[in-house]
Amino acid sequence: MKALNHFVVRVDKAFNDTMEVGDKSIYLDSKWNEFENRICYGVIESPPTRHNTGAKKGDTLFFHHHVTTTDNLRIYDNLYVASYGGWKPHAIAYRRKKDGKIVMLGNWIFVEPTEVDKTDQVTESGIVMQLGHNVKDRDVAKVIVPTDYMKEQGVNSGDVVGFTADADYKMTLDDGSVVYRMIEDNIMYVEEK
């Protein structure tokens, strides 16, 4: 199969629908915690031949969660189409098979949450205010992989950025690591060092 403008990816399992408890497997309804249990990656069967993405057959594509849940994006069996280019593309990034490097596509970026230590405080009257520990700060994140455009603007991996509310979406990658994806337009500022 030869894709022209889109990626064709093989996704063997669209949901994490099993859970191991001891020596037993529990099967989960895919609608339970649906967003948390979607698998948003697959093996590239064909990169788009009309675009020079650098991706190769066998690399791993990370994509928008709609790819495996939208009927018209399924070709057959476990093959799906992930759009590339245009407005709001499905293809987010790919991991090169040869060296494991993640390459961002379009205007998507990966970030990780910054941890905010909100230690308990004691008021003058002795009341302990439990604020919790290591709570994710929802509007600030550390850039993992910036786009080329962001690099041109001086934004690099490790920089802390502020972003618009609810712009980040949690994704679990093929190696089990958790990232948040967003579009570079959602970045409002870069903290100065």
Language-model features, listed with the residues they occupy:
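Acidic-enriched and Gly/Ser
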Residues: M1-K193
